[in-house]
């Protein structure tokens, strides 16, 4: 785990802060994609006001800050301590918003049934084995709660003659929309939707956005025997 934390600390050190205003002049906004001023807004999530929202791998907290301005009670966690410091310095004045340094699986395991919405925007859902992570996300959500995440769609295998991919410091679960739907179904999610958002003009890679809801489960009583 120390090597993973160190890799994400290096990542944090190389990032430039998000702009103070977007193209529309807003000071907070939610961005699901890897491109500025592109893609759907927070309406993908569903209801926000009054909801308890957890973001896994919130980085500098800019997406979560936006949800906080819309009336959500927000907790952002990130494995890299520097990210929490930057998030708190920029957004710590907003009400109903807090940031913690925590590893996603450890945090989820300690907070069952606590959130109405769990988000991961290019976050840990991409970097943790889903057979470990999805049951923990499901357990942390209230029945009917929304789980929404985004990451790059899987790339086709390299063609003969194409350069091999670079080695990565952290593993990545580049699943297709169908594979995510199957994994979510078996982890007790329902109403699963997947969409690949087209890239902006001149770019090649789109963005996969997945939404699912924690299945409401009836615990049936055993039938009475006569
Ligand atoms: C690609 S960045 C995305 C940050 C942010 N969501 C955004 O859209 O700008 C991934 C973030 O996930 C965090 N992260 C990666 N693995 C994690 C884990 N296992 N637990 C918690 N945070 C993690 C990293 O430190 C990093 O800040």
Locate predicted features:
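Conserved S-adenosyl-L-methionine
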Residues: 189-200
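Conserved class I S-adenosyl-L-methionine
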Residues: 1-49, 62, 146-177
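A short acidic, Gly/Pro-enriched loop at the edge of an enzyme's catalytic core
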Residues: 109-118
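A short SAM/SAH-binding and catalytic strip from SAM-dependent methyltransferases
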Residues: 117-131
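A short glycine-rich, Lys/Arg-flanked "PGG" loop and its adjoining helix->strand segment in the class I
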Residues: 131-146
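Core SAM-dependent methyltransferase catalytic element
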Residues: 198-226
């Amino acid at each position: 785990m120390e090597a993973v934390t160190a890799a994400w600390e290096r990542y944090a050190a190389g990032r430039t802060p998000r702009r103070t205003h977007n193209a529309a002049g807003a000071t907070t906004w939610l961005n699901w994609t890897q491109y500025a001023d592109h893609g759907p807004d927070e309406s993908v999530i569903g209801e926000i006001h009054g909801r308890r929202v957890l973001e896994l791998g919130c980085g500098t907290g800019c997406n979560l800050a936006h949800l906080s301005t819309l009336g959500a009670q927000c907790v952002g966690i990130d494995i890299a301590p520097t990210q929490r410091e930057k998030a708190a310095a920029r957004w710590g004045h907003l009400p109903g918003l807090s940031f913690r340094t925590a590893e996603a699986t450890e945090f989820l395991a300690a907070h069952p049934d606590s959130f109405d919405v769990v988000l991961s925007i290019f976050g840990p859902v991409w970097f943790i084995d889903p057979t470990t992570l999805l049951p923990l996300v499901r357990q942390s959500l209230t029945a009917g709660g929304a789980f929404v995440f985004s990451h790059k769609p899987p790339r086709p295998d390299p063609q003969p003659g194409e350069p091999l991919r670079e080695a990565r410091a952290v593993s990545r679960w580049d699943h297709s929309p169908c594979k995510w739907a199957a994994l979510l179904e078996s982890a007790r999610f329902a109403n699963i939707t997947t969409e690949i958002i087209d890239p902006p003009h001149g770019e090649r890679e789109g963005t996969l956005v997945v939404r699912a809801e924690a299945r409401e489960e009836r615990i049936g009583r055993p039938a009475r025997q006569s």
